[in-house]
């Protein structure tokens, strides 16, 4: 594929809901935020300093500017003499696009807690005063009155500050500015050859024709009442398996979700839209101390829509831990294995027909050379080829057999009903018996007349669903919030949250890579997964390589440095050191506004495992011939392989196996180890959430019993990753599905034991 290749189809637009009428920032606060963002990603010019407004552009000496142009041309492989695109690229600032203000407004107004929003606005206001600026920058001039170069030096100074507040502030603001610029820049994609979508010859399939219950308009204040046997809250990986099994067993099932269904022609969804339509909280939830960024699916189909296709079953040592340490012997049994095998069979999980891209090949080949354990990762792609590096924003081809392609259609065909746009506010209980659930109550919001969610002509109704049984499948972040808002008091609700924290490594190669092409995660190095002998360590894997998701996680070292680093992405591969975290955190509703709040900081124990994984990844990249190696650890420069010939192609030889005992490289790894993972400005990332309503043997140590029944209640169940007793150590999707199937089997067994049950004794679920 040439650098000018683009997707041969149009992705259907998915407009966002309107912003609040009131601007979340005042004029002074906007001026300061723009001044900071422009210092992070500055307009760079080649001009006489006397002719440049230094507040609006950062002039570079002619030789520095010309050298930068040459390097960017080489990195982007522009062959012609026309450097207009490079000039435009350098001249762009973070706020050049009119989308900047809209994206910031949406984030501040809709996706920040009141506490975080007030903190940000306070800092921005302080920097707009002489006194505040003097205290925070050392200049007695408001920040927006400083030149771009001076502002850059202020931010770099914050990076090195002894005050954790300033280090954390610098990281957060630099990350935000880079994310928005990478999403909105008109030149980054052209120079990288980044297509924004996979190249397919065929049109997107139509997708399953879901029918959703529509609540009629009414002038009455009384809620709409719907009755069913089972209501399932959440359409993610746990809820959909339960829905299929129960519907096929003959029960009347309704699945509700606060989000909406988007058909394949909307995929891969534009990044600025995907954050709102496919992910929770606008794309990311940040922990209270800012240490970890958590992404979770929030759409019809849940996390299975954005999963990277990796489909791993829980390993033996994890199952033994759950059976022995947590008193749950069924996890070591054949029935649980059958549940795992059945859900994998439905999705066509296998390692057949995988076309490993460069990044995944490097892991397998590097591990082989070093004698480390590694393997291909099974994919839920129906046993077919699935070369899609963008399906973290939805799978256009339906090659990924997620919930909207498999279990939800199966449930529909068995008679299940669906309601989208239904936010459950509380679980309801019988007035005569406060332990007995009677269903759920919440607010339903229709689509607009155009079939989207951006219009203002949307119907809102209160709805009560009366159900004999209620299953909560909102995921580890949202399930405990619903239980707490519904009045449940078990002290374990929301606690023991595990996140599989990761840190990143980037390798730069001499050849063109285009890391967004091909499947995302098809190999794993598991040599270091059991570093403590107790089942805890780090796995080494590839990660999604979309520019705005990957590049901002690395330390910002100045505007020109970042723009040159961005151009290297065309030749990059990216990796994660993923820890099976032994120690957890908690999730709870913000006491001021009820918003989801995550209290989690990676423990020293788990950070040691992450760091070990980072160093081992670097060793593997070196052995495979990477030209440059970067960690997402502040205070550590990248390793650049010395070479007398700048055009040497050290990574092209399949027989190139340089020794990791090279003195320069060894010294660099020692520096990485000595530097450690400093707090609070080392970034961590999580795409797996587990354990916040864990399963156990008693309400003294857990929230649910071995059949998913919530302690102290009747007919209330949880079927999602929140019931994991501890971290799974692998992508939790398959484990979640297997557990949900077992919980559904238990419900069917209970139904069959009751007189006049709708479930016939000889009925067999077809899963």
Annotate each language-model stretch with its function:
Residues 2-31, 35, 39-41, 47-118, ...:
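Extreme N-terminal leader/targeting segments of oxidoreductases
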Residues 221-255:
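N-terminal Rossmann-like FAD-binding beta1-loop-alpha1 element of flavoenzymes
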Residues 490-621, 628, 642, 648-651, ...:
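FAD cofactor-binding and catalytic pocket of flavoenzymes
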Residues 172-218, 330-430, 437, 632-668:
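Conserved redox-cofactor binding core of oxidoreductases
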Residues 245-272, 293, 299, 413, ...:
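Glycine-rich loop(s) and the adjacent beta-strand/alpha-helix scaffold that form part
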Residues 135-139, 143-173, 181, 300, ...:
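Rossmann-like flavin
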Residues 383-386, 391, 428, 439, ...:
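A glycine-rich dinucleotide-binding beta-alpha-beta segment and adjacent secondary-structure elements
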Residues 251, 258-317, 359-368:
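N-terminal FAD cofactor-binding segment of flavoenzymes
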């Amino acid at each position: 594929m040439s650098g000018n290749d683009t997707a041969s189809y149009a992705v259907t637009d998915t407009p966002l809901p309107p912003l609040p009428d009131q601007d979340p920032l005042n004029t002074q606060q906007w001026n300061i935020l723009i001044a900071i963002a422009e210092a992070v990603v500055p307009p760079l010019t080649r001009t006489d300093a006397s002719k440049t407004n230094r507040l609006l552009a950062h002039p570079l000496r002619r030789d520095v500017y010309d050298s930068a142009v040459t390097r960017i041309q080489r990195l982007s492989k522009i062959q012609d003499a026309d450097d207009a695109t490079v000039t435009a690229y350098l001249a762009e600032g973070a706020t050049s696009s009119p989308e900047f203000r809209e994206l910031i407004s949406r984030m501040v107004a809709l996706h920040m807690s009141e506490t975080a929003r007030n903190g940000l606005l306070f800092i921005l206001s302080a920097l707009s005063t002489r006194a505040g600026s003097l205290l925070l920058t050392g200049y007695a001039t408001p920040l927006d009155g400083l030149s771009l170069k001076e502002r850059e030096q202020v931010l770099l100074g914050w990076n090195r500050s002894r005050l954790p507040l300033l280090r954390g502030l610098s990281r957060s603001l630099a990350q935000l500015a880079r994310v928005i610029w990478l999403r909105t820049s008109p030149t980054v994609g052209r120079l990288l050859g980044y297509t924004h979508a996979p190249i397919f010859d065929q049109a997107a399939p139509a997708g399953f024709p879901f029918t959703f219950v529509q609540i009629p308009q009414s002038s009455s204040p009384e809620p709409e009442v719907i009755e069913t046997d089972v209501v399932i809250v959440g359409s993610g990986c746990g809820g959909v398996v339960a829905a299929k099994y129960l519907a096929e067993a003959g029960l009347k099932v309704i699945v509700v979700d606060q989000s909406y269904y988007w058909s394949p022609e909307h995929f891969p969804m534009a990044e600025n839209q995907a954050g709102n339509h496919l992910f929770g909280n606008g794309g990311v939830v940040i922990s209270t101390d800012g240490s970890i960024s958590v992404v979770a699916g929030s759409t019809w189909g849940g996390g299975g829509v954005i999963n990277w296709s990796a489909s791993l079953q829980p390993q033996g040592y994890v199952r033994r831990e759950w059976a022995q340490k947590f008193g749950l012997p069924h996890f070591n049994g054949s029935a649980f294995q059958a549940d795992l095998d059945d859900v994998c069979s439905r999705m066509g999980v296998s390692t057949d027909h995988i076309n490993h891209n460069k990044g995944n090949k490097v892991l397998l080949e590097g591990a082989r050379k070093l004698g480390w354990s590694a393997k291909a990762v099974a994919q839920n792609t129906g046993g077919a080829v699935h070369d899609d590096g963008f399906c973290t924003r939805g799978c256009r081809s339906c090659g990924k057999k997620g919930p909207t392609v498999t279990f939800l259609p199966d449930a529909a065909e068995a008679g299940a009903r669906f309601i989208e746009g239904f936010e459950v506010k509380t679980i309801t209980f019988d007035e005569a018996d406060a332990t007995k659930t009677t269903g759920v109550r919440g607010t339903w919001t229709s689509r607009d007349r155009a079939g989207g969610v951006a219009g203002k002509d949307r119907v809102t109704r209160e709805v009560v669903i009366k159900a004999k049984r209620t299953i909560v499948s909102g995921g580890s972040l949202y399930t405990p919030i619903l239980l707490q808002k519904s009045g449940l008091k078990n002290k374990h609700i929301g606690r023991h949250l595990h996140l599989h924290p990761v840190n990143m490594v980037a390798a730069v190669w001499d050849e063109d890579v285009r890391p967004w092409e091909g499947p995302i995660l098809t190999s794993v190095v598991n040599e270091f997964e059991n570093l403590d002998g107790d089942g805890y360590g780090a796995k080494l894997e590839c990660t999604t390589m979309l520019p705005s998701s990957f590049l901002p996680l690395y330390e910002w070292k100045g505007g020109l440095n970042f723009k040159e680093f961005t151009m290297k992405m065309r030749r990059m591969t990216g990796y994660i050191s993923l820890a099976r975290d032994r120690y957890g955190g908690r999730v709870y509703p913000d006491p001021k506004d009820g918003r989801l709040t995550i209290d989690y900081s990676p423990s020293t124990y788990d950070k040691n495992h992450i760091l070990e994984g980072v160093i081992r990844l670097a060793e593997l990249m070196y052995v495979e011939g990477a030209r440059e190696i970067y960690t997402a650890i502040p205070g550590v420069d990248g390793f650049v392989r010395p070479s007398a010939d700048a055009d040497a192609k050290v990574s092209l030889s399949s027989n190139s196996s340089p020794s990791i005992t090279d003195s320069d490289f060894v010294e660099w790894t020692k520096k990485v180890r000595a530097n450690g993972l400093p707090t609070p400005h080392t970034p961590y990332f999580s795409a797996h959430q587990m354990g916040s309503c864990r399963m156990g043997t008693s309400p003294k140590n857990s929230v649910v019993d071995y059949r998913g029944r919530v302690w102290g209640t009747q007919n209330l169940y949880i079927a999602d990753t929140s019931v994991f007793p501890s971290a799974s150590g692998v992508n939790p999707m398959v484990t979640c599905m297997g557990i949900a199937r077992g919980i559904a089997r238990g419900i069917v067994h209970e139904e069959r034991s009751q007189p006049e049950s709708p479930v016939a004794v000889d009925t067999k679920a077809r899963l």
